[in-house]
């Protein structure tokens, strides 16, 4: 009976965090609008080989993540939930692997359930796992690969070992097809310390080639198909999207070596109090094979991405699966022997909630700031933000009432965040970061436009997805579409600032021309170097400028 209650509680937890509130949040640009539009175009065109954005070749990532996103929109429609359905599914599948692997290591159902709940409630997992990017997909394949390798190395027969390594190759192949060759480097680096300490080189060399073969066979059909259709894909994807992004001096998202320290601290909420003890206990028990495996899984990718020049928080998402297992194991030991870490965790959550309440007041219309984040007419959003932090502090306090039994309720600290964050975003943020909001405000003007131009790729993708059209033209800036715009068949999809007046004269009689520009908050739009317009509609950071036929 208790198991049934636990399962009902888990399903309610998943529904409140990962299902019910998702549609209330508008899509963020540039990431969510980009991936939403790529998948929409894939469904509309029926081309499941070559990814396109705004009708242009888009070679920043391989194809598998777009497949999953497209299936999400196909099943649930072109809406906020449909766009995010794929990442939510991947996150829940990863949580299922955490459950299975924890059971496999410790044969303890309660521990497995706690590890799953901890994983799903980690701030970084929830933030990325409900955000339509490709990282939850690659995290799933990496976690599946680590589970497959363990399964292979623990098998007692050659059939079991062979099956495990074949499965490992498939997961690595799907990882390559999702985000590239890092899906090969990360698992290898993660298992090497364990293989070395356990002296399991023989099995690795005997059966490892099976993983190589299955990985190649997984990637080969699509790899050959896109090479035939687009011969430049692999050259661009390898040199620009791998070498330049991560290793060269001009790598994207450059950050210092210690970049991931604050990411891990913030990402571990609401379980931050367990982090030091989980790592220390894991190190102290490093003679235990499973503990070494989890430690290596956590630390090695972290070191690898810390050394790389290009860094983003999303890169280390897969590390938190193993960290959640270490945290759950340590938490049960602490509850039984010394609950000090659990008390510290409760106080950290109280402090975080109270700090958030104070910070919300400071940036509210009633605070000391001259330019508050929220305006007076948005008071309900301020109360939503207060509710988010109040619930965080409340559940932090509740875990202290009988800490040996109530500590798992820290998983409910982010409940207010999950349910209310979509209602608390300030209008000034929505107007710049949520193109859907802009489209809703300007729908009547945008809909009849013959041509739409914009100077932001993220806004362009949002307009294209909302209006169900892929012919948005880039104005002045090419951004990440620079490569696709270099192809001869992309002629006419970019208009420079100097060319705009002539282009306008040539196309004005064909219908309404709409220009959507991103501007600074205090920028005078009358000073823009553009021909006089027939209509201007400013929505804070975005401005709609229209030219009608004459």
UniProtKB/Swiss-Prot annotation:
Official protein name in the record:
Undecaprenyl phosphate-alpha-4-amino-4-deoxy-L-arabinose arabinosyl transferase
Question: Part of which pathway?
Answer: Lipopolysaccharide metabolism; 4-amino-4-deoxy-beta-L-arabinose-lipid A biosynthesis
Root EC class: transferase
Return the InterPro entries for the record.
Answer: ArnT_tfrase, Glyco_trans_39/83, LipidA_mod_glycosyltrf_83
What the protein does comes down to:
Catalyzes the transfer of the L-Ara4N moiety of the glycolipid undecaprenyl phosphate-alpha-L-Ara4N to lipid A. The modified arabinose is attached to lipid A and is required for resistance to polymyxin and cationic antimicrobial peptides.
Q: Which reaction does it catalyse?
A: 4-amino-4-deoxy-alpha-L-arabinopyranosyl di-trans,octa-cis-undecaprenyl phosphate + lipid IVA = lipid IIA + di-trans,octa-cis-undecaprenyl phosphate
Q: How does it sit in the membrane?
A: Multi-pass membrane protein
The induction comment states: Induced by BasR.
GO molecular-function term, one example from the UniProt record: mannosyltransferase activity
Q: Which BP terms does GO give this entry?
A: lipid A biosynthetic process; lipopolysaccharide biosynthetic process; protein O-linked glycosylation; response to iron(III) ion
Highest taxon of source: Bacteria
This protein's UniProt keywords: Cell inner membrane, Cell membrane, Glycosyltransferase, Lipid A biosynthesis, Lipid biosynthesis, Lipid metabolism, Lipopolysaccharide biosynthesis, Membrane, Transferase, Transmembrane, Transmembrane helix
Q: Where are the transmembrane segments?
A: 7-27, 81-101, 110-131, 137-154, 165-185, 204-224, 255-275, 288-308, 315-335, 346-366, 383-403, 406-426
Q: What is its main location?
A: membrane
State the organism of origin. Escherichia coli (strain K12)
What's the EC number here? 2.4.2.43
Give its localization: Cell inner membrane
- What are the record's GO terms for cellular component? plasma membrane
Q: Does the keyword Membrane apply?
A: yes
The entry sums up its family as follows: Belongs to the glycosyltransferase 83 family.
């Amino acid at each position: 009976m208790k198991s049934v209650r636990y399962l009902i509680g888990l399903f309610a937890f998943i529904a409140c965090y990962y299902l019910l509130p998702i549609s209330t949040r508008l899509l963020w640009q540039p990431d969510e609008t980009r991936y939403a539009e790529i998948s929409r175009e894939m469904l509309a065109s029926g081309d499941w080989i070559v990814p396109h954005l705004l009708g242009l070749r888009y070679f920043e990532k391989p194809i598998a993540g777009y497949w999953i996103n497209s299936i999400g929109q196909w099943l649930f429609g072109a809406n906020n939930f449909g766009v995010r359905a794929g990442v939510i599914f991947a996150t829940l599948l990863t949580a299922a692997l955490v459950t299975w692997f924890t059971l496999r290591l410790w044969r303890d159902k309660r521990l497995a359930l706690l590890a799953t709940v901890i994983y799903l409630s980690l701030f970084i997992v929830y933030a990325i796992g409900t955000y339509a990017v490709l990282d939850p997909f690659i995290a799933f394949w990496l976690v599946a690969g680590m589970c497959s390798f363990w399964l292979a190395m623990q098998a007692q027969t050659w059939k079991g070992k062979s099956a495990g390594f074949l499965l490992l190759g498939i997961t690595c192949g799907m990882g390559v097809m999702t985000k590239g060759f890092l899906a090969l480097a990360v698992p290898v680096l993660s298992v090497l310390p364990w293989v070395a300490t356990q002296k399991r080189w023989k099995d690795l060399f005997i059966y490892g080639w099976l993983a190589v073969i299955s990985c190649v066979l997984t990637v080969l059909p699509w790899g050959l198909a896109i090479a035939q259709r687009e011969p430049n894909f692999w050259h661009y994807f390898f040199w620009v999207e791998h070498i330049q992004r991560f290793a060269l001096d001009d790598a994207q998202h450059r950050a210092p070596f210690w970049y991931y320290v604050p990411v891990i601290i913030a990402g571990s909420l609401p379980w931050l109090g367990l982090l030091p003890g989980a790592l220390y206990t894991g190190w102290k028990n490093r003679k235990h094979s499973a503990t070494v495996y989890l430690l290596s899984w956590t630390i090695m990718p972290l070191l690898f991405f810390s050394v790389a020049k290009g860094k983003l928080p999303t890169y280390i998402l897969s590390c938190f699966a193993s960290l959640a297992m270490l945290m759950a194991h340590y938490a049960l030991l602490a509850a039984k022997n010394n609950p000090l870490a659990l008390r510290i965790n409760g106080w950290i959550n109280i402090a975080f909630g109270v700090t958030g309440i104070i910070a919300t007041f400071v940036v509210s219309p009633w605070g000391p700031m001259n330019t508050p984040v929220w305006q007076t007419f948005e008071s309900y959003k301020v109360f939503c933000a207060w509710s988010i932090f109040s619930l965080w502090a409340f559940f932090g306090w509740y875990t202290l009432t009988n800490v040996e039994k109530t500590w798992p309720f820290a998983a409910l600290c982010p409940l207010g965040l999950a349910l209310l964050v979509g209602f608390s975003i300030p209008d000034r943020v929505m107007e710049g970061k949520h193109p859907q909001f802009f489209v809703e405000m300007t729908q009547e003007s945008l809909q009849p436009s013959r041509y739409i131009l914009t100077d932001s790729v993220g806004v362009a993708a949002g307009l294209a997805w909302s209006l169900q059209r892929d012919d948005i033209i880039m104005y002045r800036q090419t951004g990440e579409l620079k490569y696709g715009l270099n192809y001869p068949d992309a002629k006419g999809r970019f208009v420079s600032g100097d060319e705009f007046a002539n282009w306008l004269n040539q196309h004005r009689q064909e219908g309404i021309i709409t220009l959507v520009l991103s501007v600074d908050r205090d920028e005078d739009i009358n000073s823009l170097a553009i021909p006089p317009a027939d209509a201007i509609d400013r929505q804070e950071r975005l401005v709609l400028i229209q030219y009608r036929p004459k």
